[in-house]
């Protein structure tokens, strides 16, 4: 019979940081390993033998409100933040990162978050050779034949000895009999080798290696937690017996290419951090451009692996490094290439582009300026991912008139036109992504419209061309002629006209822009804006995303502002029109009224479309639009608060990959110190409960709560100490902590991971049921609604890797020393 557990009272039900303690099987995880937290993933963990057992006579963990009456000024105060190195184990996870020293486990300390930090292995010189030459494991010494998915001849075996460093062993694992990683194979797989860690420095352990034994412990056919335990308890010197599939035979050859007008004429993908094939950091050829040097030579093929270019090695390098090496070559280029075995020689069997990355066209710097580029799917910053490829050059497009047939859709024909003055012609200036013109693929920016359904537009005015297109019916036959040079001159003229128009008074009306008495200010956008979806623009609009900084150079008009975007590199030259605060709020309130009218049967709060508004019934809705900001210099590393699904995986990876840049703080507690604990290392032990309650009332804590009659909390001072040491303090807290840190002048970087859908969540965590995925999604939507204006940025992605790359980029951009903070200026 299951032991009874006292129900927890969570002070922030929306985030429920204590949910991990709400089932019998997870009591031991409440203050210990928090690699994957249940408020993110809603999955139960199997009962572990080590989990504390409670009976009816033994009270379970209880989280109760602290000094209820005296804490009225503190909203949603709950929980506490473990300061551990984001625990070096993932008991309830599919994947574990061994990124910290082996811990000392004390029987009496389930609530101690500091336990995993204790390192029983002194960092003194070790006389034993840490990295001996590879040896082949005598598989006859194993109790039984290794689990083999394939024949014995397909595999090779190696013994690897690693010395556990300050950042642990430096690799991640997945698998086990309870959580097979690949199909039904129960093996323990290496899923990640962390740069800079012990495994990476040794250089022999590879992604997809299978661990057979850790020291003398057999980890074949064991549960995930048993493998974790074996690695944790292995000591400072860890001997790993691993199995890996033998590399397919490759033929290495040298290819000499002479650059032509189209450069080398091929595209690449892959590299460290942007693997084209999971587990493989190689640089692969993904496209041979017709007519280019590689195509004419005929030897380079899709699927070939680039080993070197001239004297520059391309093995184990980033995508950006490979791009630079290929760009900086002379006219004669020598490529060292590995040809795969015959099974891959046919293009239909080429290694799949698993990551859907966009490879770089090597020689796009040689091509003339292109006006053909269509809107590309979003990609990560160039530092973390490949840049988009250029698929076609101007020379490939005919300059002769061509016939294009479009079928009008809900978005019209899906393109914008400009021109029509003094017989200059009508040009396509923009093609809407996903619209009929885009899907057709035969029209492009820079096309001149010759006729529409037989109506000659060569001498038409703008109004005549617009009328012809509007009245053309559902099926529209267009004759277009590509004229990039004419359009280029025309675009320069448009820019000059736009500047004149933006700085002068335009005729009054609903689309007017009054520009008398210019007013300048800086704002942070609290919503996404797509100019193509705003029909009332009086002039060229300016796209922006949530969190972007905008320099509003003219805010004198009630409806429209003129603005430029501000990036980390400075202010962008392009100026455009954006909706004013008043216009945004007016349109959003009108939309919300329509939503409510059409959704009366829905219960309050159930509508995910209400994300932009806040407020109580009977009051005018508070709509997020812009926040006034000013630039400020900081001399500390900003704390980092990540909220939303998968946040714990991201937190763990940040500390694992960059232990010198990210850290965690020491919490406070009123619990008596145990013999093995050190004040200031494991906890700050507060002398009296009364003292800590006073500190809470005086807002010295960003979050606090009670466990087993003892108070736990994270103080502002603890966070400040980490920040002033030059490390970003990773905080596992609620959104309320963002506001408290801002008040304390410790401006955190708040990042919200916004799931695209329930399916998106389930794809990133395949253990979730649909119901659990739905709950996780609903929690994320409520989280966004509650704290949206406090987020520095919002990230979305199809994979965890994509999200992680975005988070790293945001933290880098927002690290300072100059940051934008909320100002008191009135909008």
Curated annotation (Swiss-Prot):
<dbReference type="GO" id="GO:0031594">
    <property type="term" value="C:neuromuscular junction"/>
</dbReference>
<comment type="function">
    <text>May play a role in synapse assembly and function.</text>
</comment>
<dbReference type="GO" id="GO:0097120">
    <property type="term" value="P:receptor localization to synapse"/>
</dbReference>
<keyword id="KW-0728">SH3 domain</keyword>
<dbReference type="InterPro" id="IPR008144">
    <property type="entry name" value="Guanylate_kin-like_dom"/>
</dbReference>
<feature type="domain" description="Guanylate kinase-like">
    <location>
        <begin position="637"/>
        <end position="812"/>
    </location>
</feature>
<dbReference type="InterPro" id="IPR027417">
    <property type="entry name" value="P-loop_NTPase"/>
</dbReference>
<dbReference type="InterPro" id="IPR036034">
    <property type="entry name" value="PDZ_sf"/>
</dbReference>
<dbReference type="InterPro" id="IPR016313">
    <property type="entry name" value="DLG1-like"/>
</dbReference>
<dbReference type="GO" id="GO:0007399">
    <property type="term" value="P:nervous system development"/>
</dbReference>
<dbReference type="GO" id="GO:0050808">
    <property type="term" value="P:synapse organization"/>
</dbReference>
<feature type="domain" description="PDZ 2">
    <location>
        <begin position="254"/>
        <end position="341"/>
    </location>
</feature>
<dbReference type="GO" id="GO:0098839">
    <property type="term" value="C:postsynaptic density membrane"/>
</dbReference>
<protein>
    <recommendedName>
        <fullName>Discs large homolog 1-like protein</fullName>
    </recommendedName>
</protein>
<dbReference type="GO" id="GO:0043005">
    <property type="term" value="C:neuron projection"/>
</dbReference>
<keyword id="KW-0677">Repeat</keyword>
<dbReference type="InterPro" id="IPR019583">
    <property type="entry name" value="DLG1-4_PDZ_assoc"/>
</dbReference>
<keyword id="KW-0472">Membrane</keyword>
<dbReference type="InterPro" id="IPR036028">
    <property type="entry name" value="SH3-like_dom_sf"/>
</dbReference>
<dbReference type="InterPro" id="IPR001478">
    <property type="entry name" value="PDZ"/>
</dbReference>
<dbReference type="GO" id="GO:0035255">
    <property type="term" value="F:ionotropic glutamate receptor binding"/>
</dbReference>
<dbReference type="InterPro" id="IPR020590">
    <property type="entry name" value="Guanylate_kinase_CS"/>
</dbReference>
<dbReference type="GO" id="GO:0007268">
    <property type="term" value="P:chemical synaptic transmission"/>
</dbReference>
<dbReference type="GO" id="GO:0043113">
    <property type="term" value="P:receptor clustering"/>
</dbReference>
<feature type="region of interest" description="Disordered">
    <location>
        <begin position="595"/>
        <end position="618"/>
    </location>
</feature>
<dbReference type="Pfam" id="PF10600">
    <property type="entry name" value="PDZ_assoc"/>
</dbReference>
<dbReference type="GO" id="GO:0099072">
    <property type="term" value="P:regulation of postsynaptic membrane neurotransmitter receptor levels"/>
</dbReference>
<feature type="domain" description="SH3">
    <location>
        <begin position="518"/>
        <end position="588"/>
    </location>
</feature>
<dbReference type="InterPro" id="IPR019590">
    <property type="entry name" value="DLG1_PEST_dom"/>
</dbReference>
<feature type="region of interest" description="Disordered">
    <location>
        <begin position="102"/>
        <end position="133"/>
    </location>
</feature>
<feature type="domain" description="PDZ 1">
    <location>
        <begin position="159"/>
        <end position="246"/>
    </location>
</feature>
<dbReference type="Pfam" id="PF00018">
    <property type="entry name" value="SH3_1"/>
</dbReference>
<dbReference type="GO" id="GO:0019901">
    <property type="term" value="F:protein kinase binding"/>
</dbReference>
<feature type="compositionally biased region" description="Polar residues">
    <location>
        <begin position="44"/>
        <end position="56"/>
    </location>
</feature>
<dbReference type="InterPro" id="IPR050614">
    <property type="entry name" value="Synaptic_Scaffolding_LAP-MAGUK"/>
</dbReference>
<dbReference type="GO" id="GO:0016323">
    <property type="term" value="C:basolateral plasma membrane"/>
</dbReference>
<dbReference type="GO" id="GO:0019902">
    <property type="term" value="F:phosphatase binding"/>
</dbReference>
<dbReference type="GO" id="GO:0098609">
    <property type="term" value="P:cell-cell adhesion"/>
</dbReference>
<dbReference type="GO" id="GO:0001935">
    <property type="term" value="P:endothelial cell proliferation"/>
</dbReference>
<dbReference type="GO" id="GO:0035418">
    <property type="term" value="P:protein localization to synapse"/>
</dbReference>
<dbReference type="Pfam" id="PF00595">
    <property type="entry name" value="PDZ"/>
</dbReference>
<dbReference type="GO" id="GO:0045197">
    <property type="term" value="P:establishment or maintenance of epithelial cell apical/basal polarity"/>
</dbReference>
């Amino acid at each position: 019979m299951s032991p009874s557990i006292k129900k927890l009272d969570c002070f922030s039900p929306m985030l429920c940081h204590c949910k991990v303690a709400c089932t019998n099987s997870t009591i031991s995880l409440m203050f210990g390993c928090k690699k994957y937290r249940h408020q993110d993933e809603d999955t139960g963990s199997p009962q572990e033998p080590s989990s504390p057992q409670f009976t009816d006579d033994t009270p379970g963990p209880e989280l109760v409100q602290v000094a209820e009456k005296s804490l009225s000024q503190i909203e949603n105060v709950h929980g506490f933040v473990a300061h551990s190195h984001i625990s070096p184990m993932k008991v309830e996870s599919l994947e574990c990162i061994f990124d910290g020293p082996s811990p000392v486990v004390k029987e009496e300390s389930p609530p101690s978050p500091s336990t995993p930090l204790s390192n029983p292995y002194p960092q003194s010189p070790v006389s034993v050779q840490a990295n001996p030459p590879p040896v082949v494991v005598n598989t006859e010494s194993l109790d039984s034949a290794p689990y083999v998915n394939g024949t014995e001849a397909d595999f090779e075996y190696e013994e690897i000895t690693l010395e556990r460093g300050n950042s642990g062993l430096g690799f991640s694992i997945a698998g086990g009999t309870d959580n097979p990683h690949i199909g039904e194979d129960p093996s323990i797989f290496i899923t990640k080798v962390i740069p800079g860690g012990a495994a990476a420095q040794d250089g022999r352990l590879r992604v997809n290696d299978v661990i057979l034994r850790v020291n003398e412990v057999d980890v074949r056919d064991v549960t995930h937690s048993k493998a974790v335990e074996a690695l944790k308890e292995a000591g400072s010197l860890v001997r790993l017996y691993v199995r890996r599939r033998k590399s397919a035979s490759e033929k290495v050859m040298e290819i000499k290419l002479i650059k032509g007008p189209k450069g080398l004429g091929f595209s690449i993908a892959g590299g460290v951090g942007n693997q084209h094939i999971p587990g493989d950091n190689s640089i692969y050829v993904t496209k041979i451009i017709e007519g280019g040097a590689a195509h004419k030579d005929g030897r380079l093929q899709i699927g070939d692996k680039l080993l070197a270019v001239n004297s520059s090695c391309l093995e184990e390098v980033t995508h950006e490094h490979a791009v630079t090496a290929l760009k900086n070559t002379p006219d004669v280029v020598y490529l060292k290439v590995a040809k795969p075995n015959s099974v891959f020689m046919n293009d239909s069997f080429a290694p799949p582009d698993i990551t859907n990355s966009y490879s770089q066209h090597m020689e796009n710097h040689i091509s003339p300026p292109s006006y053909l580029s269509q809107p590309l799917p979003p990609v990560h910053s160039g530092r973390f991912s490949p840049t988009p490829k250029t698929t076609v050059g101007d020379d490939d497009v005919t300059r002769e008139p061509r016939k294009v047939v479009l079928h009008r859709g809900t978005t019209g024909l899906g393109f914008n036109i400009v021109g029509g003055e003094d017989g200059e012609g009508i040009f396509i200036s923009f093609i809407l992504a996903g619209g009929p013109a885009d899907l057709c693929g035969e029209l492009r920016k820079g096309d001149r419209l010759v006729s529409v359904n037989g109506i000659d537009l060569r001498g038409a005015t703008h109004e005549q061309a617009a009328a012809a297109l509007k009245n053309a019916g559902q099926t529209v036959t267009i004759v277009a002629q590509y004229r990039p040079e004419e359009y280029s001159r025309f675009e320069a003229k448009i820019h000059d006209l736009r500047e004149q128009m933006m700085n002068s008074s335009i005729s009054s009306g609903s689309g007017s822009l009054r520009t008398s008495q210019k007013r300048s200010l800086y704002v942070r956008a609290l919503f996404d804006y797509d100019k193509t979806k705003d029909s009332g623009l009086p002039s060229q609009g300016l796209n922006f995303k949530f969190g972007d900084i905008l320099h509003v150079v003219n805010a004198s008009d009630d409806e429209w502002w003129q603005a430029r975007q501000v990036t980390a590199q400075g202010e962008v030259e392009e100026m455009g029109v954006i909706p004013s605060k008043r216009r945004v709020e007016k349109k959003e309130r009108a939309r919300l009224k329509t939503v409510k009218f059409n959704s009366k049967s829905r219960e309050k709060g159930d509508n995910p479309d209400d994300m932009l508004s806040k407020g109580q019934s009977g009051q005018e809705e508070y709509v997020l639009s812009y926040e006034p900001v000013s630039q400020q210099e900081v001399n500390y590393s900003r704390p980092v608060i990540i909220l939303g699904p998968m946040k714990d995986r991201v937190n763990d990876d940040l500390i694992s990959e960059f232990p010198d840049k990210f850290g965690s703080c020491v919490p406070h507690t009123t619990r008596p110190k145990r013999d093995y604990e050190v004040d200031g290392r494991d906890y700050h032990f507060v002398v009296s409960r009364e003292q800590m309650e006073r500190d809470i009332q005086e807002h010295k804590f960003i979050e606090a709560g009670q466990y087993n009659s003892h108070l736990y909390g994270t103080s502002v001072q603890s966070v400040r100490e980490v920040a002033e040491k030059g490390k970003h303090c990773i905080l596992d807290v609620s959104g309320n902590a963002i506001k408290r840190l801002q008040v304390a002048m410790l401006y955190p970087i708040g990042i919200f991971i916004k799931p695209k859908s329930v399916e998106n969540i389930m794809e990133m965590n395949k253990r979730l049921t649909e119901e659990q995925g739905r709950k996780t999604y609903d929690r994320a939507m409520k989280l966004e609604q509650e704290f949206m204006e406090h987020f520095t940025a919002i990230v979305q992605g199809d994979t965890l890797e994509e999200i992680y790359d975005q988070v790293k980029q945001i933290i880098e951009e927002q690290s300072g020393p100059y940051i934008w903070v909320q100002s008191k200026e009135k909008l």
